Each structure stands twice: as C-alpha cells, then as structure tokens.
Amino acid sequence: MEYDEEEVKVLKEVLSAFFLYRQYAHTITQQKRKSMSRLSFEHKDLLLQDSDNNFLKHLSRIDQCIEQNSVLAEAIANAAIPVFCSDFDQNELFHVNVDMMQKVSSTLKQIARDWSTECVEERRTTYAPFIEELNSLFPSDSIDRSKIRVLVPGSGLGRLAFDIAVEGFACQGNEFSYFMLLTSHFILNCVKQENQFLVYPYIHSFSNHVMRDDQVRSLNIPDAVPSQYLRNSQNFSMAAGDFLEVYGTEESRDSFQVVATCFFIDTTKNILDYLDTIKNCLVDGGYWINLGPLLYHFESEGTSNSNSDSQQQPFVELTLEQLFYVMDSMGFEVLKHNSVDTTYMGDKRSMLEWIYHPHYWVCRLQKSKLRFQ
C-alpha cells in the first residue's frame, strides 16, 4: 500500500500507540497505588485488611491483565507493519497523546463486542436484521449471491461485513480509522484458530463494577476464524479511506446493489453528503439498509466559535422526520421502518448500560423518482 507523508505519520502514531499500550496502562495502576499511599492510616487499613482480596492485590491482578492485553495489542501491530508500514522502526516509537492511547483501550473493547461469544446478543440485535433482510431480498435458491455486491461503510472490525460475506454475497467493508483497519486486518487475515487470544476489555475503567472479578474477567476471541470461511477472497474485501472520497466518485457510480450502514450515518459533519454518496454508488433499484441512532459526532464542533478551516464547513444535523423527507426527495422509497433497543459495547455485569433506541429501515433507490438531481 502507498500512503502520502501525512498518512504515514498517522500510521506510525497508531502503530506506536499499540506498542505503548503496556506502558500507558501500567501507568494507570501506578497512579492508583500512589493515590492509595496518600490515604490516612485508617483508610488504608480498611482497604488492606482482607489479605486475600485487598485493593493492592486487585491492582496486581489488573497489571497481569494488562500484560495479556499487551500480547494482543502487539500482535495486531506486528501483523500490520509489513502490510501497512514496512519501514516502521519499533525502536523509534512516536510520541502519542492520551486520546490515542484511549483509542487502543476502546479498540480492545470493540474486539470483544465484534468477535467474542459473550457479546453475541448485542450483535444479534444490531447485525442480524441486515442478514435476515439480505436473505429475504436475495434467496440463495434462485439468485447467485456472488453477483450481489454489498457495501458496508464504517465497517469497523469487519464483523458485519464478514457475516454478510459468509452468506455468499460479494461484500466490501470500508473503514477510515487506522485503529480499526489494523485490528480488522489482524482478525480477518492472521488469526488461525477460535479463541486464540484472551482480551480483558473492562480493566480500563474502575466505575460501576459490582464485583472485582467483573472488572478482570477475560473473554476469548475470536469466536470464528474468518480465514477458514472466506477461502474465496473474491467474495470479501476491505477498502481503506473516507467513505465520501472513495465512493462519491464517477468510478464508483452504480457499483453496489446494497449499501448496509450500521451505527454510521451520524459520523459525518453533513449527513446530506452521506446520502449523496449512497445514492451515487447504489444501482437504480438498489437497497439501502440502515440501523443506528442520530448521535451526531460533530454537533459540538459545529456550534463552537472557532475560526478554523473545519468550522467553515457546513454542519447538518437532521431529525429523523427531516431525514426521511430528504430521503424521499432523493428517490429513496422506504419499504420497512421500525426501531429496536440495544446497547453498544455494553457490559451486562455493569451497574450502568446506555440503551440506544436506534431506527432500522430498508429503502429502495428509485432514480426515476428523484425530485432533485
């Protein structure tokens, strides 16, 4: 792969973040120990009185979990180097900020969501509707599914795209984040057996745990080995890059029979740009399947007083009612529409879970019915 100078810099920062995970995560437990050392004698004694289950021993258990997570984080980075950045030198790691380090922790949690058995119910709620709809629209006994091209923008760690490809469709995932791209490359291409790795996704937060064991419990990943299912690589591919830039071009016009967006359409500054791009890459009569909220990621940026270049860009956040009106004007005929309740990277043992009420719809693009070209 070839990247420009700025992309190479970002890649090296992301790779460095994976290699620095061990150091960063241990810093957190070290800070906890320092904080404890400043407690009064009485308070310290309360936390240490149980010799088998005191707070310092719990921190030591977390340190052991960090070591296991580091094995996975470094395996991801090592697998990515020859493919994405062959001149990367592990002896010259880039300085990365806390935000990037937190993205490594979040990526480990995302691995659990997409590729562990424990999180299968959350995937069933959010991914199964796509599979069921595709199977209904394109029955395998009457249609050659390998001729049906499905695009999954914002494909993350590739699980939805993988599940679609397993059903026989020609599926392409698209992802912009290098954290997701490097990790999905590892899962999709490098893992050799089920449950090959342990991940401890819940150790990075000390809040809302009922039991100490809840915080330090491990999950096995992956629950499926993609390389064993996707022997015909023509049925599955991943495309790196910004959705608007990759699929808003003349070359991408009328390229897909289906676009499947899951927790995605609120990740842009101007949602109308996404609609234009979906319309561009879908064939006439093609289907757009969506499930997700409208939690606009750039809303606060759009209301800031900054004079930066990004601030000069249009920010458009529509209600669902407004969105459906615009979709109708652009030729999207809504065939199905309902809502579901789901968590996102939830923890069933936690005292706190955010419940989303995302809407699900299936649209058919009728380009002959466009009110606006």
Swiss-Prot record:
Transmembrane segments: none annotated. It comes from the Eukaryota. Carnosine binds at residues 266, 297, 356. GO terms for cellular component: cytosol; nucleus. GO terms for molecular function: carnosine N-methyltransferase activity; S-adenosylmethionine-dependent methyltransferase activity. Keywords: Cytoplasm, Methyltransferase, Nucleus, S-adenosyl-L-methionine, Transferase. Pfam families: CARME. One of its GO terms (biological process) is methylation. S-adenosyl-L-methionine binds at residues 110, 113, 154, 175, 242-243, 262, 274. Its EC number is 2.1.1.22. Its main location: cytoplasm. It catalyses: carnosine + S-adenosyl-L-methionine = anserine + S-adenosyl-L-homocysteine + H(+). It is found in: Cytoplasm; Nucleus. Belongs to the carnosine N-methyltransferase family. N-methyltransferase that mediates the formation of anserine (beta-alanyl-N(Pi)-methyl-L-histidine) from carnosine. Also methylates other L-histidine-containing di- and tripeptides such as Gly-Gly-His, Gly-His and homocarnosine (GABA-His). This is Carnosine N-methyltransferase.
